[in-house]
């Protein structure tokens, strides 16, 4: 699948916040020193109408999870077909992605690194190899690192970095055995308040 391979800081600057696209070895300000928007006229912040605000919010969430537009729209369509709040369903689907779960458990320092671990067959789901980053983890599923991958330096470093992040209530992790359990899909109350998924629903429902 195609992926964005350009500068990560450029995306964070565009959205005006840290999208967690780089490891947490250094803080966001030292990694992305410029706070201006990318481009020739980055020092001039444009005025956004309602559509522009909705679009920026969609781009922020899409880039946070490292998903291209077509796949993101498909997640929205699936969320809209499910019972309950479309916004909450959408975020639950994104959080259930295997690459995201691997990142949340601390086995990778970024979602991009988690995606690579999954693609390289370093991750097990219920003791079976799964190499599809978009695989949807179900409540009660266990996710672990394969035995031969446990000594990888990047996984050890990621686990150390993960101690600086706030724990996720919907995930339990045993770092000693490189294993975790996805207890339940999170609600909007569990997730960051840095984005408003309802704006995405408004954008796509037009």
Swiss-Prot record:
Ranges of residues in domain S4 RNA-binding: 96-161
Q: Name one GO biological process term.
A: ribosomal small subunit biogenesis
Q: Which UniProt keywords apply?
A: Ribonucleoprotein, Ribosomal protein, RNA-binding, rRNA-binding
CDD domains the UniProt entry points to: S4 (cd00165)
**InterPro entries given for it?**
Ribosomal_uS4, Ribosomal_uS4_bac-type, Ribosomal_uS4_CS, Ribosomal_uS4_N, S4_RNA-bd, S4_RNA-bd_sf
Superkingdom is: Bacteria
Any one Gene Ontology cellular component term annotated for this protein: small ribosomal subunit
Q: Which GO terms describe its molecular function?
A: rRNA binding; structural constituent of ribosome
Assembly notes: Part of the 30S ribosomal subunit. Contacts protein S5. The interaction surface between S4 and S5 is involved in control of translational fidelity.
**What family name appears in the similarity comment?**
Belongs to the universal ribosomal protein uS4 family.
Per the entry, what this protein does is: One of the primary rRNA binding proteins, it binds directly to 16S rRNA where it nucleates assembly of the body of the 30S subunit.
Q: What is this protein called?
A: Small ribosomal subunit protein uS4
Q: Which organism is it from?
A: Legionella pneumophila subsp. pneumophila (strain Philadelphia 1 / ATCC 33152 / DSM 7513)
Gene name of the encoded protein: rpsD
